[in-house]
């Protein structure tokens, strides 16, 4: 009797070519995100069919917005909860660092609130760039933690070199959008450009181009230090993380084209973190499984982690249903408005990203 075929390594699956763990996890995260959006789409069409046409009477303004907001807020709350209960926060110094970063996030929120009425397009672009650089930094972390990077190559310099490409792409996109806004003031007869008003002054366009040029020069310098053979060899060496970035940028552009917003990237970021941590827990379970339902069980086991995430997200959705159906989304209910209002979501996101700096 012949022996059974050897199982494939968990780091690789065959789909026309070998996928790395980083790529496979990203695909799984995208699939989970798509499923969540599909659920919110079903709820949205049911609510619209029931005559709930006003936004304050629905659970979400639209499927992508609702999926990103409810899942995103649950992620932000859990990130703080995990941080607050971690061992490294038992000393005073980490809390001081947290307070400083929280204050910095609050200042950025004030700046965003001041810019939003003056130029909502620019505010939205800066918000997207800030979050996407945060997401790309985390993808680099996944890349190394998954063991997909070449052995012995992990260094702060390499991590910086790998984080610059998405920054370049995003700042470049911002520059193109800024140029379009400038043209909008001079070519009002072009429908697409007309929608981008108010225009930006030429000084901002020039400043953006200078930032792009400086960032490109810095990245090329870092790449040459890591890979003397050039940019193409550097990209080939670290293909998994570059492919993930291409997929992420595609999601961003698709979201902009379909909804005019940048919300799906937040949902994708959350599902990427969920898949990454869940896989880490599944492969390295604790030696002694904690009691089911305990905080230790939810924090250290794959099953508990899944229950915690799903439970909190569903609790927030339930709160949103109560706010919309019982109170018609009244802004006078401060607790609901601060936590669940779609206008509050960018501020929660900015705080989360800023507090995560240097993690």
Residue spans for each PLM region:
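Hydrophobic core segments of alpha-helical transmembrane domains in multi-pass membrane proteins
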Residues: 65-75, 121-133, 207-211, 259-274, ...
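Central hydrophobic cores of alpha-helical transmembrane segments in multi-pass inner-membrane proteins
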Residues: 12, 63-86, 133-141
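Loop-centered beta-sheet repeat module
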Residues: 167-245
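Membrane-interface helix-loop-helix junctions at boundaries between adjacent transmembrane segments
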Residues: 96, 107-202
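N-terminal signal-anchor module of multipass membrane proteins
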Residues: 2-74, 345-348, 353, 357-358
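C-terminal transmembrane-bundle signature of multipass membrane proteins
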Residues: 245-359
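Membrane-helix interface motif
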Residues: 44-54, 175-193, 320-331
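Alpha-helical transmembrane segments
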Residues: 26-41, 101-108, 167-172
């Amino acid at each position: 009797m012949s022996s059974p075929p050897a199982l494939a390594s968990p780091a690789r699956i065959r789909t026309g070519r070998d996928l790395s763990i980083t790529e496979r996890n990203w695909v799984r995260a995208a699939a989970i995100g798509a499923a969540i959006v599909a659920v919110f789409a079903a709820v949205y069409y049911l609510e619209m069919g029931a005559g709930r046409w006003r936004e304050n009477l629905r659970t979400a303004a639209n499927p992508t917005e609702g999926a990103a907001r409810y899942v995103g807020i649950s992620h932000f709350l859990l990130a703080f909860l995990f941080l607050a209960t971690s061992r490294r926060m038992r000393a005073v110094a980490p809390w001081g660092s947290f307070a400083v970063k929280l204050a910095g996030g609050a200042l950025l929120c004030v700046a965003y609130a001041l810019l939003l009425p003056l130029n909502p397009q620019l505010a939205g672009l800066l918000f997207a760039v800030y979050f996407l650089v945060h997401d790309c930094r985390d993808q680099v972390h996944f890349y190394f933690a998954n063991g997909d990077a070449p052995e012995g190559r992990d260094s702060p310099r390499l991590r910086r070199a790998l984080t610059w490409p998405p920054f370049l792409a995003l700042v470049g996109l911002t520059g193109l959008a800024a140029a379009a806004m400038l043209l909008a003031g001079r070519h009002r007869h072009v429908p697409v450009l007309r929608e981008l008003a108010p225009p930006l002054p030429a000084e901002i366009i020039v400043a953006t181009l200078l930032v792009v040029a400086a960032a490109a020069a810095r990245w090329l310098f870092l790449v040459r230090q890591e890979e003397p053979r050039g940019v193409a060899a550097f990209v080939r060496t670290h293909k998994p993380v570059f492919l993930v970035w291409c997929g992420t940028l595609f999601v961003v552009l698709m979201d902009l084209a379909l909804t005019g917003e940048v919300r799906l990237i937040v949902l994708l970021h959350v599902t990427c973190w969920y898949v990454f941590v869940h896989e880490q827990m599944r492969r390295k379970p604790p030696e002694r499984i904690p009691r089911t339902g305990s905080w230790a069980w939810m924090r250290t086991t794959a099953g508990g982690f899944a229950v915690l995430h799903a439970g909190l997200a569903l609790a927030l959705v339930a709160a949103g249903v109560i706010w919309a159906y019982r109170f018609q989304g009244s802004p006078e209910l401060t607790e609901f408005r601060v936590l669940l209002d779609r206008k509050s979501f960018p501020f929660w996101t900015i705080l989360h990203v800023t507090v995560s700096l240097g993690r």
